[in-house]
């Protein structure tokens, strides 16, 4: 599929819309609606990819697009370590949206900005199956939740928290979150839900640390 001008919007209002062919994206691609989308073909180009609407988007391809990835609604599932394209401009998750890693992926060097909390009980950054790793720097622009349904979410990149509440955990979920990156800033850290939160970095954040439920190591 070759996208022209202006930027293209793809909507699914019910069921699952599957795209298995490659997508050339020179201008911009927004995927939304109430339905779900499964994109297994590789997305290339220099422009952005945006997920909005209440449905879900699954990216499974070895993508190389270099624009910003924005999750502004629903859930974006990542099943490829390169699903989010080039690390040049990073990924942003807004309030009411969730970026979910599954299947044992390792997203390397991708900057992540989190400007919202959670959707349907899932964290703004979540692990849904397997041991999934985020190695890039994370910046909080608002209170945020990190969660794992099962197995582990590992974060080795630094976390900059200038004054917000960073929560980890999910009710009735046994997955664990391990943060080896350094948490800095004036913000707070709270362990919620079931499972274990492990902090192994030389952290310098100055806000409180609170264990509401589960275990903190």
Where on the chain are the PLM-derived regions?
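Well-ordered beta-strand positions in beta-sheet-rich domains
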Residues: 68, 90, 109-111, 137, ...
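Glycine- and acidic-residue-biased ligand/ion/polar-headgroup-sensing regions
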Residues: 55, 71-76, 193-195, 211-216
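Short beta-turn/strand-loop junction motif enriched in small, turn-promoting residues
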Residues: 62, 81-83, 202
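Extracellular, surface-exposed repeat architectures
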Residues: 1-61, 95-201
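Repeat-solenoid scaffold signature
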Residues: 75-83, 87-102
């Amino acid at each position: 599929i070759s996208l022209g001008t202006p930027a293209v919007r793809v909507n699914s209002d019910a069921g699952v819309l599957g795209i298995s062919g490659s997508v050339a994206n020179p201008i911009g691609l927004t995927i939304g609606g109430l339905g779900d989308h499964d994109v297994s073909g590789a997305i290339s180009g220099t422009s952005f990819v945006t997920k909005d609407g209440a449905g879900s988007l699954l990216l499974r391809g070895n993508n190389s697009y270099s624009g910003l990835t924005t999750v502004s609604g629903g859930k974006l599932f990542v099943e490829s370590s390169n699903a989010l394209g080039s690390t040049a401009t990073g990924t942003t998750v807004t309030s009411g949206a969730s970026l979910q890693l599954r299947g044992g992926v390792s997203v390397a060097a991708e900057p992540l900005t989190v400007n919202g909390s959670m959707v349907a009980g899932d964290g703004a950054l979540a692990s849904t199956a397997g041991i999934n790793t985020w190695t890039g720097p994370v910046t909080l622009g608002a209170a945020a939740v990190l969660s794992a349904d099962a197995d582990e979410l590992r974060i080795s990149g630094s976390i900059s928290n200038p004054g917000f509440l960073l929560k980890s955990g999910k009710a009735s979920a046994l997955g664990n979150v391990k943060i080896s990156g350094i948490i800095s800033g004036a913000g707070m850290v709270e362990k919620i839900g079931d499972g274990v939160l492990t902090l192994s970095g030389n952290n310098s954040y100055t806000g409180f640390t609170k264990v509401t439920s589960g275990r903190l190591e």
